[in-house]
Structures are given as C-alpha cells and as structure tokens.
Amino acid sequence: DEINRIYGPRDYQDPNIIYPLDWRNPQSHAIYWAAQGLKMGSKTKYNTHEINSDRIVFQSMQALYRSGRIVVFPVDEGKAYSVFEMPDLRMYETCRKAYVDTIAKYQDMPGRTAMTIEGLRVGYRNFLANSAFSFYQTGHVRYAQRIFAELQREFPDQDKYKVTFGQFIRNRMAEEMEAG
C-alpha cells in the first residue's frame, strides 16, 4: 500500500524494511487523509491547502515518532487493561526524510519568508538532537552516534554540537535533570 510505503515506520537497522502504520493511532488517519488531499488537491504549486496538508502529514509523523507505539498491558488478571503510548523509534527515518524533503520542497518557494525555511531547519536540528539522545537512552549507541554526526554535519555553526558525542550526551542529561 502506497501510504505505508511512503509514511510507514522503518527498521532503523535496515530502512528497506517498512512496517505498516498503526491504525489505532489517530495520527495515522490524519496522514492518510492529508496525503489524499495532496494527491487530489489543486495542481497549483505552493498553494495554502498544499502547505497545510504537508504540515498535517509532517506533524502527524512527528507525533507517531514521539508517542506512536501503543502498548496494551493487562491488569487485574486480564479483566482490565492499561494503555501506554511510547516513542516509536522506527518512525525516525521517515521523519528525517520528511524534514529533508520538506525543506527542499519549499526552499525555492516564491515569496517564502526566511522564517518558513528557518523554522523547518530549527525543527530538524531539534529533531536530530532529540533523536540522538533517544537512541542513546534505548541502548542504540552506534545509531545515536550516526545521528549526532549528521547533526554536526548539517549544523556546523552551532557551538553546542562542537563537542564529542559523550559530552553531548552528558550535556543533554544535565538539561533533562534541570528541566525536572
């Protein structure tokens, strides 16, 4: 199915392995309908509806990355259940590609403001930093190091990333502790 091929979560060990979206999540439905709107919508490039539909897809993918894994845990001897939403790290590559593609798509948009692209780039920078930390926290250290290297490559002017990977992790842990 095309929606899963384009927007589905990927195995971070092998991005050629694509999983289906979890339709229990409302974000999966938002992606589906926004993608339909992009496909069927106006053929005028850069119209407001296209930009808004791209935003819906983009924000829904980020939501799936942050909390799209649904875990149902039986309690009270199976008579009741607790439902937990957890990060779905398999959405990393899909989200990363969406950032790169969306930045490229609107880079040459006539009349675009610098804020449009700069806002996307700031979001991308934060996404990479958060992802490096998330993968580290879940024990995927090598993958976290690759993400951190990409962060340094894409944002060489950012002093806070001109550190070793270990120092980056220590700094992030300190930030998390201070935030409470």
Name each model feature, range by range.
Residues D1-N126, S134-G139, E178-A179:
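Extended ligand-binding clefts on enzyme/binding-domain cores
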Residues G139-D157:
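TPR/TPR-like (Sel1-like) alpha-helical repeat modules
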Residues V141, N171-G180:
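Alpha-helical linker/edge segments of TPR/alpha-solenoid repeat scaffolds
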Residues D157-D159, F165:
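A short, surface-exposed interaction/processing loop segment used at functional sites
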Residues A129-N130, K162-V163:
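Alpha-solenoid helical repeat scaffolds
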